[in-house]
A protein has these predicted regions:
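Short, Lys/Arg-enriched segments at the junction into DNA-binding effector domains
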Residues: 3, 114-175, 179
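Charged docking surfaces used in two-component/phosphorelay signaling
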Residues: 15-23
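Short hydrophobic/Thr-rich beta-strand motif most characteristic of the beta2 strand and flanking loop
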Residues: 25-32, 40
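Acidic catalytic/metal-coordinating carboxylates
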Residues: 32-36, 59-62, 86
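Active-site beta3 strand of CheY-like receiver
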Residues: 44-51
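Receiver (REC) domain active-site loop signature in two-component systems and cognate sites
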Residues: 53-55
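Basic, amphipathic DNA-recognition helix from helix-turn-helix-like DNA-binding domains
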Residues: 65, 69, 73-134
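Positively charged, aromatic-enriched patches within helix-turn-helix-type DNA-binding elements
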Residues: 147-217, 221-224
């Protein structure tokens, strides 16, 4: 059974989310501010976090920043704000997905399932038989061990970042449009996906490139999309 932590200062929202997730067979833990969420993550084995932006003591943005220092579990941000700038901020600080309040509970459950599928797949550690190892120059992705390294140095990616990089590195030289990347990774129609994909691409570059502004591996093809450059 997956443990999901729901953090929101509105107890009615937390209780409502708990009802829907419990019906799907998940075990729900509850917190009502960012500090409580961090403390619970230190004590419990949590597979996914749903966290609100506006909260007392420690808001969702600062809490997510602190959590990302130690954990790569999927994080879904809840916020009453709907502007692109707020979505980008949530993704910039390490969130994997973003849901605007008021939200459709069934949509939230679907997003939870989607994130957990990726997280579970990323956590599988089958025997390393070398068949699923992809190397481009000094960039190495071992999909059996779910590990990434650059010039022998390990790189820590979030589940979304890993899956984007894996898609590209399995097809060096092939250009993927933003829509292709989004639909392959998120398994949903790419409506307004430009900013979402761009933010994750930037995060990947910051982790695998010596100079992200002059990338060696992850290249943009202006007006078309992104690719892993053949070496």
């Amino acid at each position: 059974m997956y443990n999901i932590l729901v953090c929101d200062d509105d107890r009615e929202i937390v209780d409502a989310i708990e009802i829907y997730l419990t019906q799907e067979g998940y075990h729900v833990l509850k917190a009502y501010d960012g500090m409580q969420a961090i403390q619970m993550l230190e004590r419990e084995e949590i597979q996914l976090l749903i966290i609100d932006v506006m909260m007392p003591k420690l808001d969702g943005i600062r809490a997510t920043l602190k959590i990302r220092e130690k954990s790569s579990i999927p994080i879904i941000i809840l916020s009453a704000k709907s502007e692109d700038v707020d979505k980008i901020l949530g993704l910039n600080i390490g969130a994997d997905d973003y849901v605007t309040e008021p939200f459709n509970p069934l949509e939230l459950v679907a997003r939870v399932k989607s994130q957990l599928r990726r997280y579970t797949k990323l956590g599988n550690l089958p025997a390393d038989d070398g068949e699923n190892v992809y190397q481009v120059g000094g960039l190495l992705v071992n999909d059996d061990l779910k590990e990434v390294s650059v010039e022998g140095e390990p790189v820590k990616l979030t589940p979304i970042e890993y899956n984007i990089l894996l898609l590209l590195v399995k097809n060096p030289g092939k250009v993927f449009s933003i829509e292709q990347i989004y639909e392959s990774i998120w398994n949903e129609e790419a409506i307004g996906a430009d900013n979402t994909v761009a933010v994750h691409i930037r995060h990947i570059r910051e982790k695998i490139e010596i100079n992200p502004k002059e990338p060696r591996y992850l290249k943009v093809v202006w007006g078309i999309g992104y690719k892993i450059e053949k070496q």
